[in-house]
Amino acid sequence: MSSATTTDVRKGLYGVIADYTAVSKVMPETNSLTYRGYAVEDLVENCSFEEVFYLLWHGELPTAQQLAEFNERGRSYRSLDAGLISLIHSLPKEAHPMDVMRTAVSYMGTKDSEYFTTDSEHIRKVGHTLLAQLPMVLAMDIRRRKGLDIIAPDSSKSVAENLLSMVFGTGPESPASNPADVRDFEKSLILYAEHSFNASTFTARVITSTKSDVYSAITGAIGALKGPLHGGANEFVMHTMLAIDDPNKAAAWINNALDNKNVVMGFGHRVYKRGDSRVPSMEKSFRELAARHDGEKWVAMYENMRDAMDARTGIKPNLDFPAGPAYHLLGFPVDFFTPLFVIARVAGWTAHIVEQYENNSLIRPLSEYNGEEQREVAPIEKR
C-alpha cells in the first residue's frame, strides 16, 4: 500500500500544479487569460490567427517580415497526399468527424520519415503541416458527406478564409465572401487556440514526456478533446438549443435539467469559478453573426438559458456556450464544431509539445490503492 493519505489524493488532479509553462496563464482570481503575456481579448481585437499561432510558438508577436515568411511556409503545405484523400473517402459517412481527424493525423505520421525527431524545428514543421492540411481534411469530410465536389485550397487566403471557402465555396451567400464573418470566425480560432494544462494539452504533454512522437501526442490530444466534458461540449450546446427550439421554453428546460440533476453543457469550468474570461469576446462575435444572419432567436435562447442558469446556480457560461450557436450561424454542421476546435488548438498543443521536449521529465503520478488486500490463489476447482 502506498504512503499517501486520503487527503493526498486529488481526483482529476484538481488543484495540482504539474509543471511550469510559459505558453499561457489562466488567472481565475481576476477572470483573465494571457498568451505569452498578452491578454487574449487584446489579441482577439488586434491580431490574426496566424499572428497568435506564431506568438504561441516563438514567444513574441511577429514582425511583418516574419509573419509573411510564416504564412508562406504554412501555405506551401496546402496539398493532401493521394493516399490520405483516398482514406478519407473510404471512411464511413456515419463516422464522427473527430475520428476522421484523428485518423488523418495518424496517417500523416506514417508518411513522415522523420516522425520520431523531437527537435523543435521538426515539431514546428509538423505544426505547419497540420495548420495547412487539417482544414482541408475537415472541408473534404463535410462536402463528401453531402455529395458535393471538393474545393481546392487557395494559397492567397488566411487560414480562416481558406477554411470557409473550402467548406462553403465563394458565392455571395458564403461566409467566406463576407469579411465580417471571416473575422468573427477567426476570432473564435484565437480564443480556442490555447488554454494552459487543459485535458487535451495535458494528454499531449504526457505522451510527449515518454519521448513518443508528435503525431502520437496530437492524436491522443484529439481523443481527449472529443469528450463532452472537454471540446465536445460545443456540439452538445447546439444540439440542446436545437432541441429546445423556442426561446420561451429555454428557462423551463434549464430548470427541468437541474431538477433532474443533469449536467448542462456550456456552463461552468474546472478553473474559472466567476466566469470564463473568453466568453465576452466570443459572445460579441456571436451577437454580430446573429445580427447579420437573422439569428435573433438564438440570441434570445442564449440569454434565457444563461439567466435561468445564473438564477438557479450562479454558474456562468464557458466558451463553448456562445461558440456553438456562432458556428451554427456560419453554417457548419454541428458534428464538426469540435474539429474546428482541433484546428485552433493545434497552435497550443504544438507549443506545449515543444516546451515539454525542451525541458522533459516523464509524467508518472502515483495512485492510492483501494482494492483487496494481498490474497492467495486458490485452485480453480475450489473457486
Swiss-Prot record:
Pfam families: Citrate_synt. It is an enzyme of class 2 (transferase). Pathway: Organic acid metabolism; propanoate degradation; Carbohydrate metabolism; tricarboxylic acid cycle; isocitrate from oxaloacetate: step 1/2. GO terms for molecular function: 2-methylcitrate synthase activity; citrate (Si)-synthase activity; citrate synthase activity. Substrate binds at residues 73, 195, 278, 345, 364. Keywords: Transferase, Tricarboxylic acid cycle. The active site is at residues 230, 269, 320. One of its GO terms (cellular component) is cytosol. Its EC number is 2.3.3.5, 2.3.3.16. GO terms for biological process: carbohydrate metabolic process; propionate metabolic process, methylcitrate cycle; tricarboxylic acid cycle. Coiled coil: none annotated. InterPro entries: 2-MeCitrate/Citrate_synth_II, Citrate_synth-like_lrg_a-sub, Citrate_synth-like_sm_a-sub, Citrate_synthase, Citrate_synthase_AS, Citrate_synthase_bac-typ, Citrate_synthase_sf. CoA binds at residues 263-267. Homodimer. The prpD2B2C2 operon is essential for growth on propionate as sole carbon source. Belongs to the citrate synthase family. This is 2-methylcitrate synthase 2. The gene is prpC2.
